[in-house]
């Protein structure tokens, strides 16, 4: 059997949808369970799960610490995930990929600017329709900031993130995950549309984080021990049938 290799993004351990599928409400319990599955897969099948070091490893460590996970979670990360720095200087990526990425980023930046312009116009329009007594300039300014600008800026931030960040590689760890997977000819495990999109561009296998635990369970369900037990049961059943026929 060809040994599988996987490169994990932080979302492979922290994805909310994955926890819901597995029936865990606690982030730490979900991380422990996934890491235990990885441990079994490594011991029974030699499946290797890598994490880019130090970028993604640091993210995982800080995520576990911020959410109050005990030392056992960090110990499992250190034990069962292979820490490896991606070889950024030797992994070849075609110039066409970078050309497409630059064009894609430019389009997203322009869309983000459009959202910002809409927010500014909305704020200006709201201000024009408000009373502005000169003797209450300070109070008026505070009211505008509180009642108008604050709410609009909040909406602007959400729209800007959606317009600019969704579907792009917006961090160094994202790029490290893809480079390491390309280097190792491994599959990427993540819950990130940007990573998924550019994994396809790079010809890297992608596995959604919420299906990864079920994939490992399926491997384990057909493991050598399980197959051997099934063969023993079948052999006993055949022997019993032969004895019955003889009688």
From Swiss-Prot:
Keyword Nuclease carried by entry: yes
Pfam families to which the protein is assigned, alphabetical: PIN_5 (PF08745)
Keywords attached to this entry: Endonuclease, Hydrolase, Nuclease, tRNA processing
EC code(s) of this entry: 3.1.26.5
Biological process according to GO: tRNA 5'-leader removal
Changes seen on gene knockout: Deletion mutant shows no growth phenotype under standard conditions or nitrogen deficiency.
Enzyme class: hydrolase
Reaction catalyzed: Endonucleolytic cleavage of RNA, removing 5'-extranucleotides from tRNA precursor
Function description: RNA-free RNase P that catalyzes the removal of the 5'-leader sequence from pre-tRNA to produce the mature 5'-terminus.
NCBIfam families in UniProt: PRK04358.1-4, RNA_lig_partner
Note from the entry: The ease to obtain knockout of this gene and the lack of growth phenotypes upon gene deletion suggests that archaeal HARPs do not make a major contribution to global tRNA 5'-end maturation in archaea, but may well exert a specialised, yet unknown function in (t)RNA metabolism.
PANTHER family in the cross-refs: RNA-FREE RIBONUCLEASE P, UPF0278 PROTEIN TK1425
Listed name of the protein: RNA-free ribonuclease P
Native source organism of the sequence: Methanosarcina mazei (strain ATCC BAA-159 / DSM 3647 / Goe1 / Go1 / JCM 11833 / OCM 88) (Methanosarcina frisia)
């Amino acid at each position: 059997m060809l040994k599988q290799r996987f490169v994990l993004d932080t979302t492979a351990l922290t994805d909310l949808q994955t926890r819901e599928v597995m029936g865990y409400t606690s982030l730490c319990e979900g991380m422990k369970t996934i890491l235990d599955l990885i441990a079994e897969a490594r011991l029974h099948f030699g499946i290797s799960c890598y994490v880019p070091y130090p970028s993604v490893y640091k993210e995982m460590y800080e995520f576990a610490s911020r959410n109050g996970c005990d030392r056992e979670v960090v110990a499992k990360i250190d034990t069962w995930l292979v820490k490896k720095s991606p070889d950024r200087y030797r992994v070849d990526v075609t110039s066409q990929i970078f050309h497409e990425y630059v064009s894609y980023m430019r389009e997203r930046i322009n869309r983000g600017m459009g959202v910002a312009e809409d927010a500014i116009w909305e704020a200006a329009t709201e201000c024009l329709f408000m009373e502005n007594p000169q003797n209450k300039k300070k109070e008026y300014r505070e009211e505008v900031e509180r009642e108008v600008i604050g709410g609009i800026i909040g909406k602007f931030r959400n729209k800007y993130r959606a317009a600019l960040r969704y579907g792009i590689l917006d961090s160094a760890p994202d790029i490290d995950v893809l480079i390491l997977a390309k280097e190792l000819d491994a599959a990427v495990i993540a819950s990130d549309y940007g990573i998924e999109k550019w994994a396809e561009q790079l010809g890297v296998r992608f596995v959604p984080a919420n299906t990864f635990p079920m994939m490992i369970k399926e491997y384990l369900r057909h493991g050598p021990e399980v197959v051997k037990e099934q063969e023993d049961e079948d052999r006993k059943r055949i022997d019993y049938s032969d004895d019955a026929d003889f009688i």
